[in-house]
Amino acid sequence: MSFKIASFNVNSIKMRLPNVLSWLDKNNIDVILMQETKTMDDNFPSLDFKQKRYNVIFNGQKSYNGVAIASKFEINEITRSLPFYNENIDEDNQARFLHVKINDVNIICLYLPNGNPAPGPKYDYKISWMKRLTKYTVRRFIQLIL
């Protein structure tokens, strides 16, 4: 089975929702990966997607980051966060990652850290996050769409 996947940095789902929904209609997208949704899970406009017959899953955060996936097919959640892999961090509250399975296809929606300025704590976080992502994808032994 084939299906059309698209990625869209929405830079605030509240501000871009009409554009996103219109774009989905015009392009007959089956699965959309959205980054920078910038909203908490409770405020994500899931009903708007459901009215268009999309299943939706999201990992939100107030004002920053946030990722979401809308699909015409069933979505099976795998995880919303990367393991730490002894990267000298205790927690990661940034909503940047969502791994799902749709029609037996593993799909990861992610919003990579910027890391500016370098050197500095944001840069260190980015490097650590990228190492964790690399370990996660390599250890899966499966094909992934990122």
Describe each PLM feature range.
Residues 1-54, 64-67, 95:
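N-terminal, active-site-proximal structural segment of metallo-dependent hydrolase catalytic domains
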Residues 3, 145-146:
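Residue-level recognition of the N-termini of beta-strands and the immediately preceding loop/turn
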Residues 19-22, 28-34, 87, 91, ...:
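Glycosyltransferase catalytic domains, chiefly GT-A lineage
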Residues 27, 52, 103, 143-144:
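Structured helix-beta-strand junction loops
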Residues 37-40, 44-117:
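Structured beta-strand-rich core segments of catalytic domains in phosphoester-bond hydrolases
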Residues 114-126:
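Active-site-proximal segments of metal-dependent phosphoesterases and phosphodiesterases across multiple
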Residues 123-145:
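A long, amphipathic alpha-helix that forms part
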